[in-house]
Amino acid sequence: MSRTKFRLVRYFLERPSGIILFLFCVLMGVLTASGTKAQRNVVVVRPKEIHDTLTNPGMGITTFQRFNGQELNPPLKWSEVGPVAKLAPAATTPDFPPTSVSYCRWYWNVLEPEPGKFDWKIVDLAISEARAHGQKLAIRLMPYSNQDSLPEWFKKSGAKRANKDSDKDGKIWQPDFSDQLYLKYWSELVAEAGARYDGNPYLDSVDISSVGYWGEGWSPYMPAFPFQKALIDIWLEAFKQTPLLMNFDEPEALAYGTQHGAGWRLDCWGDMRVSSTDPYFPAEMLEIYPQQIVRTGIQDVWQKSPVSLETCYTVPGWKERGYDVDYILEQGLRWHVSTVNIKSAAIPAEWKSKFEDFQKKIGYRFILRRMEYAKVVRPGIMMPVHMWWLNGGVAPVYNQYDLVVELRSSRQSARIRIPVDVRRWLPGDSVFDGSVYVPEDLADGAYDVRIAMLDPRTGAPAIRFAIEGRQEDGWYAVGSITVKNSEPME
């Protein structure tokens, strides 16, 4: 120590206040040195965001009554008849976005042609075809429509009819929805479907189908609410694992279904009429829908259960009518939509860029903004990890996926699960500040650091992130780390 430094130390030590100041300076020096060393052992990565359209499970534009790569519908027409056999691929690549969900629906008379004899091969085939085309299946079972009859055996079962042949709608046999035989036979179909398909990992969602044409929940012959409730309860009982979607039409029923865990769907998205004289086809987008969402209290249902929209007409039909596509798409985002059924009709060329932008916003969109971890780590200890994620979409992901960090070298690898529930990642920022255990059997050496969200059933990467670095196996490379058994951890 130099003479000057010695005199300075003695000066501090000869005074009580100086001793305190001296010790403080020594402590700060130690902490500064320790902090500097710790900072040297930290890696901070900031992946570069990408702006691609991503195909991810449970979100996006769906195919309708068909699967990826198959022939599209004409611009202004579609069929309500679901597929009952394999469909051939299109002769040329369809002008349609790739999608993770196929939405199909079938009539009761097809699924149960004789009482108690269910033709589930139809739905089994659709699930198989969806898997073969890289999709999951969303379904609705429909009692009848204005063109498709109830099963003949049901009409002869003693069930009550609500209308007569001489009525304006007499060509279609309208059931009495308060009749116990309707509840009995329809609930048997629903119960059988639930026993066979509830929890199937390749089933995306199931519509709650109850009253009226297509099971949409409206009819000139509406029963009192207790009967509607009973027809909703059979679905809640049959499907306790697969997400259910409540149809929008009847307010009290909509509120009841969503209060019991269902998401919701509507089937006239894009109807921009400002008035209507038809009580069963009111002006939807500019009258019914926005106000009914508030009046039924379902504004926040999207936070835990999905929202799905189906076009009124088709997208080319919107264009033909001169509808404001910007307003329609914006409204869908405001409702926090995850999936949209545009009836497998091609999007008009002039609107493609608008739909591409829309697809980048619907559902969830995960972006890793920042990740911090140790540069050198010793096996068998807890390692601090900090992550900042952004969900740039308008909805959460509704199924559980495991967020995993993988340490991989040419000789071995280890997967470390991050203890977060990604279903809680609402739009906006989410942060993980915690520590994870580094497996004790890791050998010394350099390891790549990779991340993924894994399907907990298969252990395979399931979610595409909006960042660079995706590798062929679906993992994202974010950095590197050194494992060193002798490394002291500060």
Please state what every model-predicted region is.
Residues A126-L137, R161-S205, F227-I234, A238:
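An active-site-proximal structural segment forming one wall of the substrate-binding cleft
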